[in-house]
């Protein structure tokens, strides 16, 4: 059977109740779709004597009243319903409790780390690479490994996780070569977030991270996105076979965000004073840079972190249930899911249902708390720079626009060149960016790939531009201005932004 997926083009308000009404819906032949007899009975006030229908009448009459007040005639409706968005406490209460307990532990007992390798000139553009582990209290069951879930000491549904044993969390840092070339340079502390099911070592093999470190004078450190890192691939595959275990991914993703918060704390409490860093001087506000999954998770980290003010999110988005079916990356994983859930309709519904848990572990549950209503213990001056690749095969630009609207971002104009967007008004709902702005901005980088399909399928024509914005020094110069100088600079000369295709 066909399935109609309706996705709001903006993030809905936490805890609010919404009424939805459907009218004018036709099939592929252009014929009006008849509403169900049960809905007609409710809509037209027909008594059925059926408890399952009559028990819903008061609720539905209230919904019809709301629609009527909005100028929508109930007689033409084919379907209507109400729903309530998860509250801020439901979405963020667990992670804030875990963050606060973790920071308390760090202040009283933490700060221990072990350097396991020091590699001078690991690359031509790196002065020294330092890898190791840091000790951290764990809020997962067991040893916090993939497949574990949050640790509770109560069956109370409102309980928050409690500490378990202390574990070792990996990290890797790179001192950029520019620190050798200018001994008086004070580097900024930065965190880097890796891509899909990757590792902290993306900081090394990702040439864009090393390049930005040198161009902007940032000493980047990275850890794993626990729950969505390379060591989680096995549990991700097991979850695709049996989604009843999905909570283990969602819980560990929240632990992973807190691990980044802890690494940020360690950055400011002695890590870079270790002799292995070669005396590099590091000072200033902590900044964040991440790509792909690092862009998806980065908005959650930005909302939760007590230290990060400015973040660059490369090829970003929010809401995995929207992203996956439009991503070429999901093809392999959907093949794992298919034997257990052979219907595409069923798979789509499952991904939509588990988004209620996923919201707690990715940006979708947090973007309402960046431009306004900051979460407890966080800064109120947060700003995001979204760098979007037009026609991206892996992270649909649709979700980046939704996130940008949520944080009140402005958009670089012209958004794209004439004829390069399927939107009637490209960048609708966003005000034009102004040179020197210090708030959130979204910029669309066009490297010549075909615009994304209208249908909910991955792009498949021309080439994938996913890597292009980060690999071009022009977009990176904009990143530098945003992160270091706290301002937006139009590096496109007042024209639509172009990125060179990656090699």
Predicted regions and their residues:
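Structural recognition of the beta-strand scaffold that forms the well-ordered cores
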Residues: 84, 189-192, 219-224, 287-289, ...
